[in-house]
């Protein structure tokens, strides 16, 4: 019999009032198996995140699979499914499952299933031990059924770089650059038949693995996420601002690849005024082109229309890469505060980009997300 390690959670027994230490980060690994294996404390959370976007028609899919104490309110651990079609129609469900089981075998294959035995429904994922591929299966009758497949693109993985996002979060990209396919049947409450969603051969995306012993409000007050392919460049960004009153500095876990080669490893957030870059760094500034026609913004108080992204190689003669990011379509708007003129929220975007190093002007698309906590 093969050697299998299992982490089995039930929502009524696996959320702890006590302090629980996560297992250690494993350098060079995808760290896909849970870090809280027998119970998770109320402040902690774990996320398995998958996305894909078509460069041809800008259709996109985003999946978030979680373990955290939010499950107590809803009777299950959450899986979020977001879809946007080429015609900009969207579909979003937050689904909750009483059981969450993740296993890893002696070959390193990790399987996870979030399930509800009563309704005979589940959403599951599997990731190869060598991180060459991952897949998801959606089996929630009358809601969502289908599958999603990610295949790692050749080149550097970035797994041998620092995975810390500030002092309290680990942010790993087991499959940071992938070709993605998906075929889903999606049901709406007012529809008698399923709508079909297909993400074909022109789609790119990836898989992220994130965890922390602290809740998001304890970690940050604002964040921006981006994964994109722009000509020969692949870009991955997560940047957070610490809570008000914190002594922590803004943090990032940002990577830039060119033709599969990792060319900039940014853990530091800087400004253009910083004279000497002693580390690979990220400059991220908001754009406000609200006077232009057809601008897209989030649904809350932050009305930026996009970002300017600059990767800066360390040293006086370090190379720079600059990209303009424009919000093209909204995938979701989720509030993080009460309604009102000063309301905050979380918005997902289809992002359109252009840029490169000096003399380059490549174009591309990606998925982005910005969140502000009140």
From Swiss-Prot:
Changing residue 346 to A: Abolishes enzyme activity. It catalyses: (5S)-3-[(2E,6R,8E,10E,12E)-2,6-dimethyltetradeca-2,8,10,12-tetraenoyl]-5-(hydroxymethyl)pyrrolidine-2,4-dione = trichosetin. Its EC number is 5.5.1.-. Optimum temperature is 30 degrees Celsius. InterPro entries: DA_C. Disruption phenotype: Results in the loss of production of equisetin and fusarisetin A. It comes from the Eukaryota. GO terms for molecular function: isomerase activity. Pathway: Mycotoxin biosynthesis. SUPFAM superfamilies: AttH-like. Optimum pH is 7. Residues 216-374 are annotated as: Beta-barrel motif. Coiled coil: none annotated. Pfam families: DA_C, DA_N. It is an enzyme of class 5 (isomerase). Residues 1-216 are annotated as: Beta-sandwich motif. Keywords: Isomerase. The keyword Isomerase applies. Belongs to the Diels-Alderase family. Diels-Alderase; part of the gene cluster that mediates the biosynthesis of the HIV-1 integrase inhibitor equisetin and of fusarisetin A, both trans-fused decalin-containing tetramic acids showing also antimicrobial activity. The PKS module of fsa1 together with the enoylreductase fsa3 catalyze the formation of the polyketide unit which is then conjugated to L-serine by the condensation domain of the fsa1 NRPS module. Activity of the Dieckmann cyclase domain (RED) results in release of the Dieckmann product intermediate. This is Diels-Alderase fsa2.
């Amino acid at each position: 019999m093969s050697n299998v390690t299992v982490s089995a959670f039930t929502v009524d027994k696996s959320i702890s009032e006590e302090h629980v230490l996560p297992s250690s980060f494993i350098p060079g690994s995808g760290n896909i198996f849970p870090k809280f294996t027998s119970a998770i404390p109320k402040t902690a959370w774990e996320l398995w995140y998958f996305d894909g976007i078509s460069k041809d028609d800008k259709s996109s899919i985003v999946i978030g699979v979680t373990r955290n104490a939010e499950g107590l309110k809803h009777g299950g651990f959450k899986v979020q499914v977001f879809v946007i079609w080429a015609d900009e129609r969207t579909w979003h469900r937050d689904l909750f499952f009483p059981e969450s089981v993740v296993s890893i075998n002696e070959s390193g294959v990790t399987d996870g299933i979030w399930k509800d035995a009563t309704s005979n429904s589940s959403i599951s994922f599997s990731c190869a031990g060598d991180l060459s591929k991952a897949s998801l299966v959606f089996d929630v009758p009358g809601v969502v059924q289908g599958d999603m497949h990610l295949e790692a693109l050749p080149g550097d993985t970035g797994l041998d770089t620092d995975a810390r996002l500030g002092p309290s979060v680990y942010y790993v990209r087991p499959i940071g650059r992938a070709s993605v396919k998906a075929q889903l049947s999606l049901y709406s409450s007012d529809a008698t038949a399923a709508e079909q969603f297909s993400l074909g051969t022109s789609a790119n995306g990836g898989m992220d693995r994130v965890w922390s012993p602290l809740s998001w409000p304890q970690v940050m007050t604002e964040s921006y996420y981006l994964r994109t392919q722009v000509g020969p460049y692949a870009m991955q960004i997560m940047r957070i601002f610490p809570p008000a009153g914190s002594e922590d500095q803004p943090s990032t876990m940002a990577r830039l690849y060119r033709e599969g080669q990792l060319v900039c490893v940014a853990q530091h957030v800087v400004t253009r005024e910083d004279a000497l870059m002693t580390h690979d760094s990220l400059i991220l500034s908001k754009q406000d082109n609200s006077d232009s026609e057809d601008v897209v913004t989030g649904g809350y108080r932050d009305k930026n229309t996009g970002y300017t992204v600059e990767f800066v190689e360390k040293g006086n003669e370090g190379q720079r890469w600059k990209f303009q990011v424009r919000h093209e379509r909204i995938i979701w708007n989720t509030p993080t505060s009460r309604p009102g003129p000063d309301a905050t929220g979380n918005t997902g975007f289809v992002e359109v980009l252009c840029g490169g190093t000096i003399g380059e002007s490549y174009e591309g698309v990606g998925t982005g997300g910005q969140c502000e906590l009140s």
